[in-house]
Amino acid sequence: MNENIESVKKYNLWFGNTIDCGFPRPLYTENVASYLGSKVVKVLTGQRRVGKSYILRQTAMHLVQQGISSNNIVFINRELTAFDFIENYKDLDNFIRLYREELKPEGRIYIFIDEVQDIDGWERVVNSLSQDYTEDYEIFITGSNSKMFSGELSSLLSGRYVEFHIFPLSYGEYASIHQLPVGRESYLTYMADGGYPELVHFQSSDVKRNYISGLKDTVLLKDIIRRYTIRDVRLLEDLFAYLVNNSSNLLSVTNITNFIKSKGRKTSYDTVSLYLGYIEEVYLAHRALRYNIKGKEILSGSCKYYMNDLSFKNYLYAGFGYGAG
């Protein structure tokens, strides 16, 4: 067996292997399942650690339960060192070819690629496979950056992909996992804990705080600082903290810039605007624009930011700013 196939087989369902599928999240898996059988590319987007990988695995297990051979399902996860040999689209194309030679799947092949943006030029292979009329592929990908469809791929796959945005656990999911009755007390517990799935396994507040701190640092470092070569890392971190502590308040780039300058920091409107955009792109925060109901138009300038999860506020900046909003 090829050494690359050998190194990744334990992360696949081949040879009777089993994989951890986490907590059932039917809100998403049932939606994805409604598109099974079509060749449109299924795209799961969302911040790191919200559970995209588990939803992929749950979808794969659904296929197996429907009678699809496990040899027809292949997982690729660029966050795992076992897949480090897949650096670019040529490596990805070669791996899929090797997989076909080694496993010899018959019929439709289901390809799951996790954190696809970490493969340089990935869109070339995804586009090629999705349009290959000589072979039968169905492709599922996840990504942690909202700009993954902003360029060439949006044109290449126009009308041939469907996107599912994945959020942290909802209150209903949280209550179900913890087997809590729905009500005010469990809701307040959810608001205090936050919805990142991994937090379910932790009991200590210190452990949860360390996890959330590490998550924040990972997203800022991997998805922003390295990707965009950030020059002022401290400014990026300060802007993130500012958004957390002013979540749901009416803000503008101008007043944020003025606030930073009032603290004796050197920056500019353009830099602040750019960094805020990066924070949005990796789904750490969501921007809500002002809407003029009477004029039926979006008003420029002020807007509100909402964090992807309350855990950043609760565990990292609990002593500052306003409440949950």
Language-model segments: what does each one mean?
Residues 53:
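Walker A/P-loop
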Residues 48-49:
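Walker A (P-loop) phosphate-binding loop of P-loop NTPases
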Residues 44:
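Hydrophobic anchor at the beta1->P-loop junction of P-loop NTPases
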Residues 1-38:
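A short, basic N-terminal segment
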Residues 74-107:
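Short glycine-rich substrate-engagement loop in P-loop NTPases that contacts/grips substrate
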Residues 123-141, 154-155:
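Conserved catalytic/switch belt of AAA+ P-loop NTPases
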Residues 72, 205-325:
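Accessory nucleic acid-recognition modules appended to NTPase machines
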Residues 2-9, 17, 144-146, 150-250, ...:
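Interdomain motor-coupling "hinge/lid" segment immediately C-terminal to the ATP-binding subdomain
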